[in-house]
Amino acid sequence: MSTFSQTVPELVAWARKNDFSIQLPVDRLAFLLAIATLNGERLDGEMSEGELVDAFRHVSDAFEQSTETVAQRANNAINDMVRQRLLNRFTSEQAEGNAIYRLTPLGIGITDYYIRQREFSTLRLSMQLSIVASELKRAADAAQEGGDEFHWHRNVYAPLKYSVAEIFDSIDLTQRIMDEQQQLVKDDIAQLLNKDWRAAISSCELLLSETSGTLRELQDTLEAAGDKLQANLLQIQEATLGRDDLHFVDRLTYDLQSKLDRIISWGQQAIDLWIGYDRHVHKFIRTAIDMDKNRVFAQRLRQSVQNYFDAPWALTYASADRLLDMRDEEMTLRDEEVTGELPPDLEFEEFNEIREQLAAMIEAQLNVYRERQQPLDLSVVMRDYLTQFPRARHFDVARIVVDQAVRLGVAEADFTGLPAKWQPINDYGAKVQANVIDKY
């Protein structure tokens, strides 16, 4: 998020001095959203008191509140919002009794979050990234040209601080809103499954696929522009090397690099977490279907046994010959691997099986480093592990090793801001970029 120039005591004293207080019950929040919606339809951005009362009357009807005291309650709500600095009131001697109201920046910020920011748009994100790329390219070119302190402030620092950083904050806010929407979708799915899971299957599938598609769309757009943005930031950082007077530019560049890395990293992590949740829901549905079938069969069998003397029956079973997979003799003579596509369920079970076994074994072996307080070099440890598995398993094993290693501790070198060197971990070109973990 944006960095603040004020300290915590200064902000606390400022809030106390101005007596800031916000209380927005659901009906008042709905009233504020109605004001913002109607205000957006006006070119001048102004509303009269009568228009505010009409908006309040509509909200009051929606909440089934009394119609007899609408005018009085509307007047109280308007005065309360003016007092909370959500609305500004303007009066004049020429038009006494007819005040003009405008939303304050605080009111716009609250309504913008609830109305505009919740509307995810790939086009909007693409335009934001396009603007960021243009601003970064211009700043990188200005940094390569060099100049006096005024040149660096105007052509490098200002675009980074007041354009790039703000757009990064907007993208970060979009991700946080997506996090909240994911939780709402999970709640909706839980309610659907608790009511009637048979009727809820199609609705759950729709919610899962829509959320997965939105997350993937967001991440693909970010990754497509991420490398280019990082390259421009590195150019600016290289231009400031050896210049002690440009520490403010170097610090801002480092903050932007960290923010961009965090945005892209969290986007991928959110996708991984959602995939895990998606599989969990499908596993629950499959289990529910199996349990339901077994329950129906057991109930019918119990009734048949109880009513045997009234309605005798006979049980017939068949044991068919097993089907053998016969392959062509020519295929056995070839030295090619004959494979086929596994169903997604089997692939998931196969991955879970190896993950559970390896995770426990790797966790026990890596704990030795923490107990002995020995530095843990991921490149060396991963190379030793990967030699024990076929090439097809290298990615899964490496991922498990990294997951278990980062739980043990951190590398002090990560706090220096310098990137780690790429180290090979197998004989097929795979590499890892990680500092030595030395703080547990």
Swiss-Prot record:
Lineage, opening ranks: Bacteria, Pseudomonadati, Pseudomonadota, Gammaproteobacteria, Enterobacterales
InterPro entries the UniProt entry points to: Chromosome_partition_MukF, MukF_C, MukF_C_sf, MukF_M, MukF_M_sp, MukF_WHTH, WH-like_DNA-bd_sf, WH_DNA-bd_sf
GO biological process: one example: chromosome condensation
Keyword rRNA processing: no
CDD domains according to UniProt: MukF_C, MukF_N
Summary of the function given for this chain in its UniProt record: Involved in chromosome condensation, segregation and cell cycle progression. May participate in facilitating chromosome segregation by condensation DNA from both sides of a centrally located replisome during cell division. Not required for mini-F plasmid partitioning. Probably acts via its interaction with MukB and MukE. Overexpression results in anucleate cells. It has a calcium binding activity.
The keyword Transmembrane helix appears for this protein: no
Annotated GO MF terms: calcium ion binding
Record-stated family: Belongs to the MukF family.
Alphabetically ordered keywords of this record: Calcium, Cell cycle, Cell division, Chromosome partition, Cytoplasm, DNA condensation
Residue stretches spanning the membrane: none
Region (Leucine-zipper), start-end ranges: 208-236
UniProt subcellular location: Cytoplasm, Nucleoid
Protein name as annotated: Chromosome partition protein MukF
Any one of the GO CC terms: cytoplasm
Subunit annotation: Interacts, and probably forms a ternary complex, with MukE and MukB via its C-terminal region. The complex formation is stimulated by calcium or magnesium. It is required for an interaction between MukE and MukB.
